[in-house]
Amino acid sequence: METINNRNPQEINTNETMIENPKDKVSNNNFIPKLNLNNNNLNKINQPGDSETLDNRSNPSSPIESPLSTARISSSHNILFKTRGYYFIKPISKGGYGQVFLAITKSNKFFAIKSINKRDTIGKHMVKELMVERNILVQYQNQSIVKLFECFQTKKKLYMVMEFLHGGDCASLLHSLNTLEEREAKNIIAQIVNGLEFIHSCGIIHRDLKVENLIFDKNGIIKIVDFGFSEVGFTGNSIKNGNKKNNKCLGTPYYMSPEVINKRGYGKTIDWWALGIIIFELLSGETPFVGDNQNMIFEKITNYTNEINFPSYFSEVAIDLIQKLLQVDPLKRLGANGADEVKRHPFFNGVNWSKIYSPESLTFKPKIENEYDSSYFFERENVKKTVSAKKTNNKKPIKRYLFKGFNFKKN
């Protein structure tokens, strides 16, 4: 039986850059890679033990000790602060314009709550984006999208109360395993395709699809999160002209398509481009376009001519899928005619699309110890920075009307 990650992946560039890779600097205080990959006959990985690391084991069924600390939240739940009946325990991630905390109620229910500073939102001209995310999560419910339960505000802050997803994001999974085998990644990628198919059917473009915004629930089902940069109102395979309808260059540089960077106009295919980047990253441990700063990354993407150097262990079918998703011409890009043409690609041969969420199909099964277990998230000192509107100094009183309609409570 082949062990997970028994090959030597390409060396990852660990130089500090203007746009940090979350693999470069990591605080290891609160993450345990208690991974349980289940893909047909793939051996299960048990709770970390005493002797071997993830990258240097010979017996895939033996206990594994993580080099990372095993610190956990105590049962006493140290409280950082509280508001509106929610007790905030610890930060678990950062989004495009807010920080996400694990919180508990008096009835012992756990939630992930995004805390957003009103003044920062106004200063970054992100009020519209905030309301777009709120409206998407209120209007659309699907197993591929994180659930929203409540939105409320105080004098200085906005809060979005969402389901707590125990399994951590794909970035944390990569931090633990470095790379995934294609057979391990296939179901994960299929779930992402299904998620994109749903949001595109609703006329939504995510615009910031990346491994940090793909989070596993406790069963191993992927949820798409962080719709702050999303755009709505796309029908069919329409292309929006960036110069006329939206001249903002938004997203995370590593995942941005050439047409977004050049503001030529864009459509749903920018998400399929991002999927191509994500697949490359899942299989190799790094994104295909890297640089010491944002401009260098943009230059590599805009000068890209449909040729990438692939690691030798990539299969021909995986290379073909990635190349077709990273087609420079958005109208020729795989997915331009809808998700069905992506699903028909030979990479997905053998995938039963009606059963990709069944327990026997899921390849990543978190081993959750309790309802407040957040150990699958690793803390990032630096994250991949997003590109958004420039912040302006704004010390004027916050105008309440700007956030009218934000409040929401699910029945």
Swiss-Prot record:
Segments forming domain AGC-kinase C-terminal: 349-411
Keyword annotations of the record: ATP-binding, Kinase, Nucleotide-binding, Serine/threonine-protein kinase, Transferase
Pfam annotation, one family: Pkinase
Enzyme Commission number, as recorded: 2.7.11.1
Domain Protein kinase: 86-348
Segments of this protein annotated with the region Disordered: 1-69
Record's keyword annotation contains ATP-binding: yes
Catalytic activity field: L-seryl-[protein] + ATP = O-phospho-L-seryl-[protein] + ADP + H(+); L-threonyl-[protein] + ATP = O-phospho-L-threonyl-[protein] + ADP + H(+)
InterPro entries, per the entry: AGC-kinase_C (IPR000961), Kinase-like_dom_sf (IPR011009), Prot_kinase_dom (IPR000719), Ser/Thr_kinase_AS (IPR008271), Ser_Thr_kinase_AGC (IPR050236)
GO molecular-function terms, A-Z: ATP binding; protein serine kinase activity; protein serine/threonine kinase activity
Active site: D208
Biased composition (Low complexity): 28-46
Gene3D superfamilies listed in its UniProt record: Phosphorylase Kinase, domain 1, Transferase(Phosphotransferase) domain 1
Superkingdom of this protein's organism: Eukaryota
Entry's Gene Ontology BP terms: intracellular signal transduction
EC supergroup of this enzyme: transferase
Residues noted as binding ATP in the record, renumbered to the chain: I92, S93, K94, G95, G96, Y97, G98, Q99, V100, K114
Homology family: Belongs to the protein kinase superfamily. AGC Ser/Thr protein kinase family.
Name the UniProt record assigns to this protein: Probable serine/threonine-protein kinase DDB_G0280717
Gene source species: Dictyostelium discoideum (Social amoeba)
Lineage: Eukaryota, Amoebozoa, Evosea, Eumycetozoa, Dictyostelia
